[in-house]
Amino acid sequence: MEVYLVGGAVRDKLLGIPVYDQDWVVVGATAEQMLNAGYSPVGKDFPVFLHPKTKQEYALARTERKTGQGYKGFECFFSPDVTLEEDLLRRDLTINAIAMDSQGVLYDPYGGQQDLQDRILRHVSEAFVEDPLRVLRVARFAAKLAPLGFRVADETMQLMQSIVASGELSALTAERVWQEWHKSLLTPAPQQFLAVLRQCGALAVVLPEIDALFGVPQPEKWHPEIDTGIHTLLVAEQAAKLSSSAVVRFAAQVHDLGKGVTPPSEWPSHKMHCHTGLKLIKQLCERVRVPNEFRDLALMVCEQHSNIHRAAELKPQTMVKIFNKLDVWRKAERLNDILLCCQADHAGRQGLQDHPYPQAERIQLAYQAALSVEVQSVIQDGFKGPAIRDEQERRRIEAVKAALLNA
């Protein structure tokens, strides 16, 4: 029985970046031997076992054969005769097909170390096209490794385009699409996930609402980049710099979906996009099974970002009305998340990345002033029933007015 560390752990170790998960492959063993050694079986479709102490995953070496459509259409073959090279051959990218033994000796039959050095994401074999999920995985690796200068090999991009052309992406479940998208939101460069999917044609299939933004013009006065799709990539990049929250990053990526359905006769203006975008966000989130926490913030940002950009013009009563609608009295962190998205939107414009965003400070000032009006003081002054809320509202507006006058 031979045990090797494989996949992302070896890749990240060689790149000098933190290793979080360790996966192992076992060559020359049977399931019975693993059970006798105290390992617990967890694999449903193929033999994967948990180590009795570390609880890390150990998989028996296996080969795969395409038997049907989609990423589930595979038959696994495992036996003590399957070699390490055969197991590594079924993997997606050369940089993920390097193994390391207990002595630290590397086994790299497919040139993964050279591709690590050259910063290339390259498929291991032509069997790459058999699994449509790999299109999304490569896009995610491009996002994860973008700061190190990685790019997708031209021949791998061609295979990704052929997978898209085959129609196999439609076999991906909503859960798998969201799983990869969500993981990409936690990478250093989430915009690369969208950019690579766009390049191979997959964005139009899995996230058509975002793909529809490319080629849609905006007023050059406010958007030097003009193209709404390019703006979306820039906003995604800025959101990742401003916040590590996947929820904030998601909301920033989808806040302008409404611009994708503006009639061309109205271009480059998008007067109704804050309203039309709401339906598209709901539709996207339902189809891809996006968690409610992500959907809710995205809807708020979509509806309010234009108002917040105009903070200098907003009347105190309008500000309080917005605070009420967002329910920031009970959820203070929500306002901060929305302002981060708006700041990313403001900075996500060609050549304007470093422009200040005083609107956030003004909204926060107004919020703190309104928050200082406590309901207890209203009750102590003799107000009862519905009059309590009305008076608190009136005092909040006055407090905001005074705070902004003194600013």
UniProtKB/Swiss-Prot annotation:
What UniProt keywords are attached to this protein's entry? ATP-binding, Hydrolase, Magnesium, Metal-binding, Multifunctional enzyme, Nickel, Nucleotide-binding, Nucleotidyltransferase, RNA repair, RNA-binding, Transferase, tRNA processing
Reaction(s) catalysed by this chain, per the record, are:
a tRNA precursor + 2 CTP + ATP = a tRNA with a 3' CCA end + 3 diphosphate; a tRNA with a 3' CCA end + 2 CTP + ATP = a tRNA with a 3' CCACCA end + 3 diphosphate
* Family annotation (PROSITE patterns): HD (PS51831)
Domain HD residue range list: 228-329
Positions in coiled-coil regions: none
Q: What GO biological process terms does the UniProt entry carry, in alphabetical order?
A: RNA repair; tRNA 3'-terminal CCA addition
The record's family statement is: Belongs to the tRNA nucleotidyltransferase/poly(A) polymerase family. Bacterial CCA-adding enzyme type 1 subfamily.
Domain observations? Comprises two domains: an N-terminal domain containing the nucleotidyltransferase activity and a C-terminal HD domain associated with both phosphodiesterase and phosphatase activities.
NCBIfam families of this UniProt entry?
PRK10885.1 (NF008137)
Protein name according to UniProt: Multifunctional CCA protein
